[in-house]
Amino acid sequence: MTDEQIYAFCDTNKDDIRCKCIYPDKSIVRIGIDTRLPYYCWYEPCKRSDALLPASLKKNISRCNVSDCTISLGNVSITDSKLDVNNVCDSKRVATENIAVRYLNQEIRYPIIDIKWLPIGLLALAILILAFF
């Protein structure tokens, strides 16, 4: 298909999965802006073999220098302190390591002086400075 045919089809079928790379959701574009990584480098519909991509978008995708990794957590058991992480990122290494687990310190420490006295204290300090200088 030519670029004109792709745009004509996708203009009338914006919800088609093959057109999602041309017309992504606003949330996808926002994630791309926040991560400073263009959405077309990692967005799944852009990687589909049947995706409708104009020549300019194909050229931009070819410049993406991204290693797309899928990392999933397997058996997470706190009682045995065992964490099984499966990394599918062009490597065959699967490591299972024992990790020492301890509870977080959840002790609440209150400030020495209540915060509501801060503006009054600053006002008193300003008056003292003005009175003596």
Curated annotation (Swiss-Prot):
Principal place of residence: virion
Keyword Ribosomal protein: no
Protein's membrane topology: Single-pass membrane protein
A Gene Ontology term for the protein's cellular component: viral envelope
One of the GO BP terms on file: symbiont entry into host cell
Subcellular location: Virion membrane
Keyword Protease tagged: no
Keywords, in A-Z order: Fusion of virus membrane with host membrane, Membrane, Signal-anchor, Transmembrane, Transmembrane helix, Viral envelope protein, Viral penetration into host cytoplasm, Virion, Virus entry into host cell
Transmembrane segments: 112-132
One Pfam family this sequence matches: Pox_G9-A16
Recorded superkingdom: Viruses
InterPro entries reported in the protein's UniProt record: Pox_virus_G9/A16
Main function: Envelope protein part of the entry-fusion complex responsible for the virus membrane fusion with host cell membrane during virus entry. Also plays a role in cell-cell fusion (syncytium formation).
Entry's family note: Belongs to the orthopoxvirus OPG104 family.
Quaternary structure, from the entry: Part of a stable entry-fusion complex (EFC) which is at least composed of proteins OPG143, OPG147, OPG155, OPG086, OPG094, OPG107, OPG104, and OPG099. Formation of the viral membrane is necessary for the assembly of the complex.
Protein name per its UniProtKB record: Protein OPG104
